[in-house]
């Protein structure tokens, strides 16, 4: 039955009577075995100690009390108490219920009994004597206490389960939050990568290997233009400076012999310089000299400047007053005494200088007899050979060293007709360039006729100087250099009386290269062929190294004849193809093979159209792109 106050299950009257009878029987058995009252008292005290130990174990699992011994002593004490003092047992149970009244106890006695008996039976299976004692006694009080502790443990487990459930809920919430943050971070990363790719596409790539070839081509093109421009400026500047120098030498007095401190010398210089300085030609040269400093390259006007430079200077137009002044100056110079050691050689030198002045007519009264060339000059009006052969009045006469042959072609152009430099022999001396200047001139029918005529043409030329004048110059003891416009040939006379009129060059003919007289250099039997409209770089290179159709190669012609084999034809073709020759030779000189250099040129021809098609540019375009090499 259940106590209404403590809710503790207590045994009924029948169970108490049954317990007392069992207790009496047990006590009788103990007396028979000689246990006596002392043994019963010991069991009662052991029962109390066992109950406290069970409570201590249930409340404090870490206690070191032996649960097995406590259960054994409790069961023994309960059996003795139920048989001898039922009221005390009942009171003890009531007290025990009051002691643990704060612990919630299950309302189901059946369930409690089941849990309690199950726990008791599992803890004491190995001791047969203890099981016999429990089965013989009344375990109601023990079951009640065990059920209370089990209920308490169950309540604690429920609290722990709720706490664990809350913890798991928090963990799930955190995992969901982490997953959401991860998804947001992935979306943010994707957007950032997309923006970075867009920025990367907008930024120009400087180290793109596809653009290196284009950059190299543009650089080569700019370098070629710069080289062509600089070479052209040097040629034009040197030509203009040479022309101005020759005109200034006309007015210079450094080459004139010393005339002493006579009054006639000052009058002579004034009378000689003033008439020419007042002319229009002298002023035009001064203006041209100033303009030369501000020269600007105009490639389209190359041929125009050539034509202008090829024109001879205009003949000086003198008035009648100027002629009278010059005539008086000549008469005053004739009357200058030439005796004395200082001026012993003055007469012939001055007469040689005046040989290039205007042919001034003089009256018979003004003429004086003179054994020098001046008399020949005065009488030249009646000499048809000298009259027809006199030079331009704007000529430059230099008395002194006559070794001016190297200045003959200072202004000669080394350019071909397209305006690009053709340095056939590279860096050569000035004399070598003079001999090969024919290669840089425009060949016409007249020039070719002059070349075929040979040196004998000078002897048949009616404009050649008479032999008497030449001998007088040779015997005068002076060394005279006569020069004219850049296109006329200079006459150099030295102290040698073995000059012959057949060896004198014509005054108004252009300089020409005299070839050797051996049959090899006359190029009469040379047969060669150049490829017409080549379609590949390999064909041009084979033409240079091997030859076409068994004919001599270009390299062989260059090594054997120099530039003489192409003076009359194929000049432009060779000048254009020479750029390809030089490009390949420079690569071979730097350690590359001929095939590699040819492949480089072929790859330069390849380009891509708007329709993304690969095509090749022409050989002419390739040659033009290599200008300046």
UniProtKB/Swiss-Prot annotation:
Keyword terms, alphabetized: Activator, Nucleus, Transcription, Transcription regulation
**Keyword Nucleus attributed:** yes
| Acidic residues: compositionally biased ranges | 402-425
Q: Which Pfam families match?
A: GCR1_C
This entry's Gene Ontology molecular function terms read: DNA-binding transcription factor activity, RNA polymerase II-specific; RNA polymerase II cis-regulatory region sequence-specific DNA binding
What is its subcellular localisation? Answer: Nucleus
- Report the InterPro entries cross-referenced here: HOT1, TF_GCR1-like
Name the chain's protein.
Answer: High-osmolarity-induced transcription protein 1
């Amino acid at each position: 039955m259940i106590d209404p106050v403590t809710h503790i299950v207590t045994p009924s009257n029948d169970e108490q009577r049954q317990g007392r009878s069992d207790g009496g029987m047990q006590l009788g058995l103990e007396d028979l075995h000689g246990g006596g009252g002392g043994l019963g008292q010991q069991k009662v005290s052991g029962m109390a100690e066992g109950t406290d130990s069970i409570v201590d174990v249930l409340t404090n699992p870490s206690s070191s009390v032996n649960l097995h011994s406590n259960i054994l002593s409790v069961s023994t004490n309960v059996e003795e108490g139920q048989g001898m003092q039922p009221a005390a047992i009942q009171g003890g149970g009531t007290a025990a219920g009051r002691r643990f009244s704060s612990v919630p106890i299950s309302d189901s006695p059946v369930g409690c009994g089941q849990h309690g008996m199950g726990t008791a039976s599992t803890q004491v299976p190995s001791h047969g004597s203890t099981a016999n004692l429990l089965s013989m006694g009344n375990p109601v009080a023990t079951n009640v206490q065990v059920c209370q502790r089990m209920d308490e443990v169950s309540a604690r487990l429920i609290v722990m389960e709720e706490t664990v459930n809350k913890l798991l809920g928090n963990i799930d919430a955190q995992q969901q939050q982490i997953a959401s943050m991860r998804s947001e971070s992935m979306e943010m990363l994707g957007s950032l990568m997309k923006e970075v790719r867009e920025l990367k596409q907008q930024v120009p790539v400087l180290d793109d290997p596809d653009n290196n070839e284009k950059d190299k081509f543009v650089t080569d093109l700019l370098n070629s233009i710069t080289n062509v421009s600089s070479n052209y400026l040097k040629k034009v500047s040197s030509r203009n400076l040479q022309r101005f120098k020759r005109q200034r030498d006309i007015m210079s007095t450094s080459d004139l012999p010393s005339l002493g401190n006579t009054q006639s010398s000052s009058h002579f210089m004034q009378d000689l310089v003033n008439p020419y300085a007042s002319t229009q030609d002298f002023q035009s040269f001064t203006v041209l000299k100033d303009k030369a400093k501000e020269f600007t390259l105009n490639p389209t006007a190359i041929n125009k400047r050539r034509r202008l430079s090829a024109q001879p200077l205009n003949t000086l137009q003198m008035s009648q007053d100027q002629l009278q002044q010059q005539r008086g100056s000549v008469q005053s110079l004739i009357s200058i005494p030439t005796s004395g050691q200082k001026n012993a050689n003055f007469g012939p030198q001055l007469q040689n200088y005046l040989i290039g002045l205007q042919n001034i007519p003089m009256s018979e009264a003004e003429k004086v007899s003179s054994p020098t060339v001046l008399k020949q000059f005065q009488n030249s009006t009646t000499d048809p050979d000298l009259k027809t052969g006199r030079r331009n009045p704007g000529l430059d006469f230099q008395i002194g060293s006559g070794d001016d042959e190297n200045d003959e072609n200072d202004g000669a152009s080394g350019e071909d007709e397209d305006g690009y430099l053709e340095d056939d022999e590279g860096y050569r001396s000035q004399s070598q360039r003079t001999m090969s200047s024919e290669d840089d001139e425009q060949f016409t029918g007249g020039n070719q006729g002059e070349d075929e005529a040979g040196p004998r043409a000078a002897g048949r030329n009616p404009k050649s100087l008479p032999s008497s004048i030449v001998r007088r110059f040779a015997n005068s003891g002076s060394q005279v250099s006569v020069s004219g416009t850049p296109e006329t040939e200079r006459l150099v006379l030295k102290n040698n009386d073995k000059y012959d009129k057949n060896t004198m060059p014509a005054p108004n003919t252009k300089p020409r290269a005299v070839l050797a007289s051996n049959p090899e250099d006359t190029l009469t039997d040379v047969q060669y062929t150049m490829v017409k409209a080549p379609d590949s770089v390999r064909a041009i290179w084979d033409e240079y190294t091997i030859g076409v159709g068994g004919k001599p190669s270009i390299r062989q012609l260059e090594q054997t004849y120099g530039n003489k084999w192409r003076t009359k034809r194929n000049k432009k073709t060779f000048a254009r193809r020479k750029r390809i020759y030089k490009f390949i030779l420079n690569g071979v000189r730097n350690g590359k093979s001929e095939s590699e250099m040819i492949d480089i040129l072929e790859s330069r021809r390849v380009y891509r159209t708007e329709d993304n098609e690969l095509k090749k540019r022409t050989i002419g375009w390739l040659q033009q792109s290599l200008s300046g090499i």
